[in-house]
Swiss-Prot record:
Positions of short motif 'HIGH' region: 47-57
Protein known as: Valine--tRNA ligase
Gene that this sequence comes from: valS
Subunit annotation: Monomer.
Source species: Nitratiruptor sp. (strain SB155-2)
Compartments reported by the entry: Cytoplasm
């Protein structure tokens, strides 16, 4: 083994990964020698081709890889299905910007030419995130990698759409939708709401046939050109006499009725509400209830149309200022007051979203009924379980899903129209030649594309061959894949896409295959900085996973994320944690170096007999660790599994096993075999260093030996309760002696004698003497007089004070006592001052009270020590 005192991950990570992938270990038959007939399937949430690996990705893929490596080593035929998403809006935006930088507008070159540019960009730049994933050490079946717009998945998308179309579950109609003037139609969950400081404009609407006017309050005065009624509550005494009359819209003089509706909140604004059915979702419903006209006042780009009179041709938000100015000039503004309200923004570009009536394609909400029913029957289990409640709450409010997007890049909606006879039909073919009804060739395809999430919703089964036709058969998927791997065993993803993606996969999977697509769904929380702040470029607290791998290693990053992944809690990631687990890799490396000083290579644990008591003790501790790690992984408690591994390898094996073996060198061969086996237990979390140390301790190299990743995962080792109790008592004695020595400033010195009261055998003396630095150990049955005492869990220890010069110790304690007494006096005076307690900030007062209590406790401890040493 290298003489270097630190492990160098850069020397092994890329080399090992290339060997693993080249040998096919990531494929479903990569572990065929140990397969037991069970299967395990997990889907990679397909990252966007525009994406770069961020820390949230690193968490998702680390947790997935831990489960995949665990199941693979445990004999399962394992499929981790990789792939990327075409990311409609994001990808089109990237390519549009590139072309604009060259002076090219997509409209000038047309759809087909533009799509050629997109495909070219995808081939050249769209796999950056896949390259970055390899640096993390993940092990999906790369040979099966899919792309949401590969030919097979295009076939599957058409299959799904056409079936839903003819079942009446996909329909087209004029709906009130969320409209981004940059990115087009958005589904409800693609709109992000932020509280904004705005204004509430009180506008005077003249009452027809009267000198009076009705005041309405609105946050969007530019939309009043689309008003078709003013609405009041029928129980509002202020306005009862006006119901049925009309008002005249300022500036444009169009008359609209005053109507009554119990939905009006009499407390909001003036209690009179403008009704704009074409530009407000609530007004849309009012318009339908009262048969009001629907007047659209701006186009797809947010430009006001002729309905706005002199303001036609002005962008909507710019028009707001001009409309208000004009209304003020004409005396139609009663007042403007500050008003906080929720404003919807496009999740992709940040534009203010407008409610807008537009002909769009929708998936009807009824498709979700069976999926919700089966989820609540337990067909899918959520981890943490409270996410089922969130799922149910969202599904109760589910509306029809708008799936059409006004883009060029994406799955083209497979609906065709005949200009000759007006026939409309959906087709599973990529191209149609003629109308099936009249035979005319004057046909055209719907220009819109599908929401990216539509193809993603098919991911758990389309990647397994469903609807693919023959494309990719025998390469990307095989005849029995769907039967073998559907439903998938597990999905791991962030909670933030539960509704974007997870719920929709459940709808589609249940509808087409009559089973929910996952047995278990694990939803992890957000990765935040060490202070719990969300990471953002503006805050300067972003932790880049690629930079982190470069500085700390992939293993350190993976283990840190796993150790912090408590179910239901956000992860607070810090450099201190990363350093801690980088130090862990060095601790493991140096443990192996120590073992190899005594013996160059070690047998497999299964091939040796453990004879020494120390070997039996460490094997028993290892057996308990195996049980805990397996139980925790099986219930997705990644943090608990990582904590167990860290505690066993550092706290038990390195801190005690190795140190105790310096007394009993006969145990080193046994400890080496246990340590080598423990690398298998750790491997799913830290694949690189475990491979390195496993090969080193085997006396070979990965070039000439099979990888650790296809070795059987450790099963329970024998646990000897009697041996464990014996060594726990020895360790307790050592720790107690060290504490007692520290009290008399002799922590690092050898002392002549210690008396121990407890259940210990003669063989324990050698261990205690060596590790506690004591010349003579004597077992006693009664407490000793004139001695420093420490009481442990199983023993009491006594260090006789005879012959020990206590003067320096007493001087130190008396100085500490004097200093603490002054501090207590000062704090007591401050807190007894009524003016201070009354006028100082409450937090400062509480801080001083806590400081006083702490100082008093420390003084009591020192006085106890002085009393003990001067008895």
């Amino acid at each position: 083994m290298s003489k270097a005192t630190k492990y160098d991950p850069k020397k092994v990570e890329r080399q090992f990964y290339q060997i693993w992938e080249t040998r096919g270990y990531f494929e479903t038959d990569g572990n065929k020698k140990i397969q037991n007939g069970k299967t395990f399937c997990i889907m990679m949430p397909p990252p966007n081709v525009t994406g770069r690996l961020h820390i949230g990705h690193a968490l998702t893929f680390t947790l997935q890889d831990i489960m995949v490596r665990y199941k693979r080593m445990d004999g399962y035929e394992t499929l981790w299905q990789p792939g990327t998403d075409h990311a409609g809006i994001a990808t089109q935006n990237v390519v549009e910007k590139q072309l604009l930088s060259k002076g090219i507008k997509k409209e000038e070159i047309g759809r087909e030419k533009f799509l050629e540019y997109v495909w070219k960009w995808k081939e050249e730049s769209g796999n950056a995130i896949v390259t970055q994933l390899r640096l993390l050490g993940v092990s999906p079946a790369w040979s099966r990698e899919r792309f949401t717009m590969d030919k097979g998945l295009k076939n599957a998308v058409r299959e799904a759409f056409v079936n839903l179309y003819y079942e009446g579950l996909i329909v087209k109609g004029n709906y009130m939708i969320n409209w981004c003037t940059h990115d087009g139609a958005l589904s409800d969950i693609e709109v992000e709401y932020e509280e904004k400081e705005g204004a509430l404009y009180h506008i005077k609407y003249p009452i027809v046939g009267s000198d009076e006017y009705l005041v309405v309050a609105t946050t969007r005065p530019e939309t009043y050109f689309g008003d078709t009624a003013v609405m009041v509550n029928p129980n509002d005494e202020r306005y009862k006499h006006l119901i049925g009359k009309k008002v005249r819209l300022p500036l444009i003089n169009r008359e609209i009725p005053i109507i009554a509706d119990e939905h009006v909140d009499m407390e909001f604004g003036t209690g009179a509400v403008k009704v704009t059915p074409a530009h407000d979702p609530n007004d849309y419903e009012v318009g339908k209830r009262h048969n009001l006209p629907f007047i659209t006042i701006f186009d797809e780009n947010g430009i006001l149309n002729e309905e706005a009179g002199e303001f036609a041709g002005i962008e909507r938000l710019e028009a707001r200022k001009k409309v208000v100015e004009k209304l003020e000039q004409e005396g139609f503004i009663e007042k403007i007051e500050p008003h906080k309200h929720q404003v919807g923004h496009c999740y992709r570009c940040g534009n203010v979203v407008e409610p807008y009536i537009s002909p769009q394609w929708f998936v009807k909400a009824e498709i979700a009924k069976e999926a919700v029913k089966k989820a609540n029957e337990g067909e899918t289990k959520f981890y943490p379980p409270q996410w089922l409640n969130n799922f149910n709450a969202w599904m109760r409010e589910l509306r029809d899903w708008c799936i059409s997007r006004q883009l060029w890049w994406g799955h083209r909606i497979p609906v065709w129209y005949c200009r000759a006879c007006g026939h409309e039909w959906a087709s599973k073919k990529e191209h149609e030649e003629s109308c099936p009804k009249c035979g005319s060739t004057d046909i055209y395809q719907d220009p819109d594309v599908l929401d990216t999430w539509f193809s993603s919703a098919l991911w758990p089964f389309s990647t397994l061959g469903w609807g693919n036709g023959d494309w990719g058969k025998g390469v990307k998927w095989f005849e029995d894949d769907l039967k073998k791997f559907y439903p998938n065993d597990l999905l791991i993803t962030g909670f933030d896409i539960l509704f974007f993606w997870v719920a929709r996969m459940m709808m589609m999977g249940e509808h087409f295959l009559h089973k929910l697509p996952f047995k278990d769904v694990y939803l992890h929380a957000l990765v935040r900085d060490e202070h719990g702040q969300k990471m953002s470029k503006s805050r300067g607290n972003v932790i880049d996973p690629i930079d982190t791998i470069e500085e700390y290693s992939a293993d350190a990053l993976r283990f840190t994320l796993a150790a912090l992944a408590v179910q239901g809690r956000d992860i607070r990631l810090s450099k201190e944690r990363l350093e801690l687990y980088r130090n862990f890799t060095n601790k493991l490396y140096n443990a192996a170096r120590f073992l190899q000083i005594h013996q160059e290579k070690f047998d497999d644990l299964q091939n040796i007999q453990i004879k020494t008591d120390l070997g039996k003790y460490i094997l028993s501790r290892f057996g308990l660790a195996i049980q805990e790690v397996r139980n925790n992984l099986n219930s997705y408690r990644f943090n608990d599994a990582a904590t167990t591994l860290y505690r066993f390898l550092w706290g038990e094996f390195c801190d005690w096993g190795i140190e105790l073996s310096k007394v009993n060198k006969d145990a080193i061969a046994e400890l080496g075999a246990i340590f080598k086996e423990s690398m298998k237990l750790l491997h799913p979390f830290m694949p690189f260093i475990t491979e390195f140390l496993y090969q080193e301790l085997s006396g070979t190299s990965i070039e000439e030996n099979e990888s650790i990743m296809i070795q059987p995962y450790p099963k329970a080792a024998p646990i000897d309760e009697e041996i464990m109790k014996r060594f726990e008592t020895i360790i307790d004695a050592i720790v107690s002696i060290r504490r007692a020595k520290a009290l008399i400033d002799m922590a690092n010195k050898t002392i002549p004698k210690v008396l121990i009261k407890g259940d210990l055998e003669e063989s324990a003396k050698a261990y205690i003497s060596k590790l506690a630095k004591v010349e003579t150990i004597e077992f006693v049955s009664e407490p000793a007089e004139n001695a420093v005492t420490d009481i442990g869990n199983y023993v009491e220890v006594f260090i006789p004070l005879e012959g020990i010069d206590l003067t320096p110790i007493l001087n130190r304690l008396n100085k500490q006592k004097e200093k603490l007494q002054k501090e207590i006096d000062k704090l007591s005076r401050m807190l007894s001052n009524e003016n201070f307690v009354k006028n100082a900030p409450q937090a400062v007062v509480e801080q001083n009270r806590a400081a006083l209590a702490e100082a008093q406790n420390r003084l009591a401890t020192i006085e106890e020590e002085l009393a003990r040493l001067t008895r």
